[in-house]
């Protein structure tokens, strides 16, 4: 099920996306049109199988655009091939707690406007900023079809998908 803004993006096509993921898929489509140089799209969402979830979401949007006649089936084939577009799984040992009023106050004191913390009717707390703990470690599936920077020099661990999945537990 798509969020309403993403569903509207499917109807509008890749030329006028509004949702962040729709914008990303639109940029992937532009890359495809420009020759399809391989790329890795890395999710830093702190959830299990994040690469799979990101891939599935990107494909859902692209399939909607293909059904609507906005993109050719070749784009879906390109996007589906992990030698063209990979979605490495990752696991980050970092907790992002609820937004802190102290951080909101600090940002406001610095002159940043609109730092109000809100709570939805379902109890979800959100803010236009993120406060987080310092990262302890980052584990990435080493599947980058066009190469990657030497992030292991900064302490990132590269491994296979099975090891990333084990580290999630």
Model-derived regions, located:
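Substrate/ligand-engaging "lid" and interaction regions
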Residues: 1-169
């Amino acid at each position: 099920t798509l969020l309403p803004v993403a569903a509207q993006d499917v109807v509008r096509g890749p030329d006028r996306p509004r949702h962040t993921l729709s914008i990303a898929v639109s940029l992937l489509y532009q890359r495809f049109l420009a020759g399809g140089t391989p790329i890795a799209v890395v999710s830093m969402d702190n959830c299990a199988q994040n690469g799979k979830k990101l891939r599935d979401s990107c494909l859902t949007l692209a399939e909607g655009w293909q059904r609507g006649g906005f993109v050719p089936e070749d784009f879906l084939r390109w996007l589906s091939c992990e030698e063209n577009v990979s979605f490495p799984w990752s696991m980050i040992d970092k907790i992002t707690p609820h937004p802190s009023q102290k951080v909101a106050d600090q940002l406001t004191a610095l002159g940043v406007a609109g730092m109000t913390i809100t709570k939805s009717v379902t109890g979800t707390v959100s803010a236009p900023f993120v406060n987080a703990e310092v990262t302890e470690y980052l584990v990435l599936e080493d599947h980058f079809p066009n190469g990657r920077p030497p992030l292991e020099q900064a302490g990132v661990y590269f491994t296979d998908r099975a090891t990333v999945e084990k580290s999630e537990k």
